[in-house]
């Protein structure tokens, strides 16, 4: 059975059992700071399990692309570890539970209509006190000796939904290991029993303060399952490891062809096959390679693959040559890979070239830095910072040469270098506790805010936090757009949020309301209209970025408020000022063209046929809302928009910044932008005026270029940035000119420093002279005095400086003596040396001794 057949068999089976098919989410999590990557099938569905949102069906099935890197060192060493994998799942949110979930699993695995796995090849584990799970398996015909109680069969991560689980193992026979089911019971690493499916019965609300036996039952019991496609393929295709299945072997054959090395189970082939899939899928979803967060993870993966490639003869970039093989192998199911293939190859090749250019020097430095069988933390950090070696790669190299690495020292060096600090987000998938009252409230409420900003409504529910109305004109915070504010019966509506079943909860003083009250709702019109301008402008910006930077650009997040908009995108190169200006001009042109903004409500399949773009991280029902700007920009969107692009008035990009891992944030304003610009650039103007005041205080006649006028374009930001550089340089020029004049004046007065008595070693004292004048002064004094050695000691408010010039090679000796006496530091050559000290009390004692 091919992997494609396995996928379709899984999805069709659960579809026939009343499940809706949820498309795979992006590998990049949306609004979830606990995750670096989507790492399980349940991860994108957490909001359904904790009750934050209600799904359109209580039965869901999916095949979710996932990345986990905690076991990266095992990739290639074992038969089944991967960084990229596909997790097949079926989920019940408050619908069927334990008995049905087990029955579904049994039927799918053993029925000749589906996977047709012999029952005697399967072993099941269960939580020791979960009698219901055990008895359900027994009733289905599983033998007692194929059921194994395991204390660890309880899924729990912190507070929130938790419960027992049952795991299903496939027995590959004694040719893999003579030992039997004790391998499962005692959790011994082995190649005989392969875990293919885990079914979690989420029935308790975990509380760290309570014993497990005291956990309360969840108001909605859930089923969460995960089955690795790669493991299923290994079992059903009868291969020795996952890497000989059709999910990896085409890549291995391509590596054979490129390297000229025959595959015979070598770890290098497996690592390369796994890692290139991770890179292709992650970059296709908008991730980039960098030195922080998920970008650092990808860079480490690429460089690890290159390192193993070198071990089979690759001495030039090769990973980019494998991209087409991955696309051919996977694009039947993941069609977006075809669209992104070209840009993925470019990004991988660019990173490979960068690494290959430093890798030889890095390896040489590593071997040269080894002392007494150990690599210091400082050298390990240099390999990371200068040569681009991830510490994990350095450790692998070191282990191959029998060397230890000072990890503690490396971490200390990394901490010091603040600019390289990486995001230390913990990768978990903990869930919030369920709110029973909100979960159970399913009375419908209508949003009428597309057409009305004032309505008479009825209160249908009062919660502690706020009230729900039968109909409301107030937009709730969603889709990147802030909520409306305004009033209900004269009381201020602070915020509006969506409840699990989609109703709008108005955050307001609730004591004034009871259920059944008739109320008057008034939305703040100014705020709504400004928000609408910004939201429509965001759609224009999105399309302008694709037109300018390339079709690979994907939205990574957005904020549409009344005062500004922000828009996050992925891009693999630094965005140039000229590109930003081009994007801005495109949006401004679309505003001038006075294009009607039309909203369509239609079936999702029709919307897709029209080419409408889905918004980042959003889930859609069967009927969707599409916002169409003259067929130039067409997006799925539930937000509020202007009727015509001319309503936006104007558009200005105010900043573009990198926010890490190849992600850029655009910030912009709309409306009467010229009146807002000065406030936005005030910090830059303040810096410029400080420089101007400084220059005028030093030289009031110094000519300066005029300050550029503000025009209401990103060009203002560029002009002021350049002017700030110019004025900063002018300030330094004026300072140097004045300093040169001051030194000239000091030199003209050199005779006033000469003491009456000239000795072989003559000491000269001065107060508060500029540091830059001391060397020219001692040169002049030395020529005038003709002593063997001249010492110039200058005392300022917080330190003393001393310079020594000698024709008898005594300068270094004198400096060393002064350093001892004055508790100072310094050095130099026999004919000239200098030093300094902050111990002014010792300087005063020294002067008294000289007098």
Curated annotation (Swiss-Prot):
UniProt-listed Enzyme Commission number(s): 6.1.1.7
Cofactor(s) essential for the protein: Zn(2+)
Molecular function, one GO term: ATP binding
Binding site for Zn(2+): 535, 539, 637, 641
SMART domains, sorted: tRNA_SAD (SM00863)
Top EC category: ligase
Keyword Cytoplasm: yes
Keyword NAD: no
Keywords: Aminoacyl-tRNA synthetase, ATP-binding, Cytoplasm, Ligase, Metal-binding, Nucleotide-binding, Protein biosynthesis, RNA-binding, tRNA-binding, Zinc
Chain ranges passing through the membrane: none
Compartment(s) where it occurs, according to its Swiss-Prot or TrEMBL record: Cytoplasm
Family: Belongs to the class-II aminoacyl-tRNA synthetase family.
Recorded domain comment: Consists of three domains; the N-terminal catalytic domain, the editing domain and the C-terminal C-Ala domain. The editing domain removes incorrectly charged amino acids, while the C-Ala domain, along with tRNA(Ala), serves as a bridge to cooperatively bring together the editing and aminoacylation centers thus stimulating deacylation of misacylated tRNAs.
Biological function: Catalyzes the attachment of alanine to tRNA(Ala) in a two-step reaction: alanine is first activated by ATP to form Ala-AMP and then transferred to the acceptor end of tRNA(Ala). Also edits incorrectly charged Ser-tRNA(Ala) and Gly-tRNA(Ala) via its editing domain.
Protein's name in the database: Alanine--tRNA ligase
Species for this entry: Acholeplasma laidlawii (strain PG-8A)
Gene encoding the protein: alaS
